[in-house]
Swiss-Prot record:
Residues 1-17 form the signal peptide. Essential for male fertility, sperm head formation and sperm penetration through the egg zona pellucida. The chain crosses the membrane at residues 18-36. This is Testis-expressed protein 46. It comes from Homo sapiens (Human). Testis-specific. One of its GO terms (cellular component) is membrane. Keywords: Fertilization, Membrane, Signal, Transmembrane, Transmembrane helix. The lineage of its organism: Eukaryota, Metazoa, Chordata, Craniata, Vertebrata. It holds the Pfam family DUF5531. Its main location: membrane. GO terms for biological process: single fertilization. InterPro entries: TEX46-like (IPR038788). It is found in: Membrane.
Length: 121
């Protein structure tokens, strides 16, 4: 199977690519249009650029905002870690108390079962 067959079987984009490859003048024209479009976009972007002092001021504001975001992110991580650590420590405190309660119930249950099982005959 040739490259054209593989591209044509790949779908719509593959069929268009195969057609462009078979028609070299059309491919050349398409690439030339892309080149003109990119040149126009670069010229248009150059007209939209701000003067140097305004760009510097905007850059400083962006950097300052990014620094504030980093500080807030670090504070959130600190709070998150404290909450997780507090949750783990409270779970560890409650867990032995549950065991202690179970032991207390176990110690009561045998005496109750002894009392109920020993019925007068």
């Amino acid at each position: 199977m040739s490259l054209h067959g593989i591209l044509a079987s790949a779908g719509t984009i593959g069929a268009v690519a195969a057609w462009l490859m078979s028609y070299k003048p059309a491919l050349f024209g398409f690439l030339f249009l892309l080149l003109l479009l990119s040149n126009w976009l670069v010229k248009y972007e150059h007209k939209l650029t701000l003067p140097e002092p305004q760009q510097d001021e905007i850059l400083q504001r962006l950097l300052f905002s990014e620094m504030k975001m980093k500080v807030l992110e670090n504070q959130m991580f600190i709070i998150w870690n404290k909450m997780n650590h507090h949750g783990r420590s409270s779970r560890h405190r409650n867990f032995p108390m549950k065991k202690h309660r179970m032991r207390r119930h176990e110690s009561i249950c045998p005496t109750l079962s002894d009392c109920t099982s020993s019925s007068p005959s």
